[in-house]
């Protein structure tokens, strides 16, 4: 995409890579769909890096402003979808 992902420059390179993979998965949910287990695994790693709800909301807002995609709505949809199913928005 032609925009800059919201990143915290205090994160390690490994953490940045994990967060970017999560952002890419959110994009794929809107564009094609992603297997629920894969998305939730990336979300769990994201939550290890960003454990605070306030920080998650801030990142979601920034991500939505640049991409048009909502992390919150995507994860809510994933929680509604059965195991081994595709999450699609």
Swiss-Prot record:
InterPro entries for this protein: BH2638-like_sf, UPF0223
NCBIfam families on file: PRK04387.1
Family label: Belongs to the UPF0223 family.
Name this protein carries in UniProt: UPF0223 protein BcerKBAB4_3787
């Amino acid at each position: 995409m032609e925009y800059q992902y919201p990143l915290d420059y205090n994160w390690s390179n490994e953490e940045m890579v994990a967060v970017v993979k999560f952002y890419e998965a959110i994009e794929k949910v809107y564009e094609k769909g992603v297997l629920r287990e894969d998305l939730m695994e990336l979300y769990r790693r994201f939550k290890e890096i960003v454990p605070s709800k306030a920080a998650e909301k801030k990142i979601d807002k920034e991500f939505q402003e640049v991409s048009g995609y909502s992390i919150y709505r995507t994860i809510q949809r994933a929680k509604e979808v059965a195991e081994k199913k595709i999450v699609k928005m």
